[in-house]
UniProtKB/Swiss-Prot annotation:
SUPFAM superfamilies: F1F0 ATP synthase subunit A (SSF81336). This is ATP synthase subunit a. Its main location: membrane. It is a multi-pass membrane protein. F-type ATPases have 2 components, CF(1) - the catalytic core - and CF(0) - the membrane proton channel. CF(1) has five subunits: alpha(3), beta(3), gamma(1), delta(1), epsilon(1). CF(0) has three main subunits: a(1), b(2) and c(9-12). The alpha and beta chains form an alternating ring which encloses part of the gamma chain. CF(1) is attached to CF(0) by a central stalk formed by the gamma and epsilon chains, while a peripheral stalk is formed by the delta and b chains. Belongs to the ATPase A chain family.
Length: 239
């Protein structure tokens, strides 16, 4: 498979991936424009595009409610925005491929492990912050000693593995999808007879990838709210 690289720039000694930065900003813009377009002229009885927006919001509520319980409304907008971002980020790389010489200029941000790890770290920070905010530092830290103080190392290890597994699950699925699609595109170059076969296979793979991308956005939000729910519902664990 032909090797391409993403253009980078250094700032204050830190190397930034320009393709990932621009694609991430584009994902945010697309998600914002979608919400802006579907939320214009809201009516009590929704019709048309407002139905689409409310259906997605209700779908996200259905994901998070079992995990957050009475705190569902507190985090519903965060979960909604997170779902939109991850879903669009997962799928944007399927639209096209832009390559200038050896530089790749178009990709799914979530096909980059740094992005997924960053999202997972953000989730971890929110979880700890909300746990401390809801219950105070003493009660929050005491929970790491449950059910016994001997479980402290395992509880700390669980926090680390949550971050790693959340990021690796998303990265592995999206990156693998882009690799397979790139291989199918290169298959079309073998001969003129391979082009229609590669096209059909690529269309089928894109459809399957969209489905997988939706599942991964669902799982990411589900696990995120599961982790948050465990932190904010400390006082209900024993009930």
């Amino acid at each position: 498979m032909e090797k391409t690289i993403n253009p980078t720039v250094k700032f204050l000694g830190i190397e930034f991936d320009l393709t990932i930065l621009m694609m991430s900003l584009l994902v945010v813009l697309i998600a914002f424009l979608f919400v802006f377009w579907t939320s214009r002229h809201l009516k009590i009885k929704p019709t048309g595009r407002q139905n689409v927006l409310e259906w997605i919001y209700d779908f996200v509520l259905g994901i998070i409610k079992p995990n957050l319980g009475s705190y569902t409304k507190n985090y519903s907008l965060f979960a909604f925005c997170l779902f939109l971002f991850v879903f669009v980020a997962n799928n944007i790389g399927l639209l096209t491929k832009i390559q200038v010489k050896d530089y790749n200029l178009w990709t799914s941000p979530t096909a980059n492990f740094a992005v997924d790890f960053g999202l997972s770290l953000m989730v971890a920070v929110i979880c700890h912050f909300e746990g401390i905010r809801k219950h105070g530092l003493k009660t929050y830290l005491k929970d790491y000693l449950e059910p016994t103080a001997a479980m402290l190392p395992m509880n700390l290890l669980e926090e680390l593995t949550n971050i790693i597994s959340l990021s690796l699950r998303l990265y592995g699925n999206i990156y693998a999808g882009e690799v397979v699609m790139a291989l199918l595109v290169q298959f079309a170059d073998f001969s003129p007879y391979a082009t229609p076969i590669a096209f059909l296979l690529n269309m089928a793979w894109i459809g399957f990838s969209i489905f997988i991308s939706g599942i991964q956005a669902y799982v990411f939000v589900l696990l995120t709210t599961t982790y948050i729910g465990k932190k904010v519902n400390i006082d209900t664990k024993g009930n």
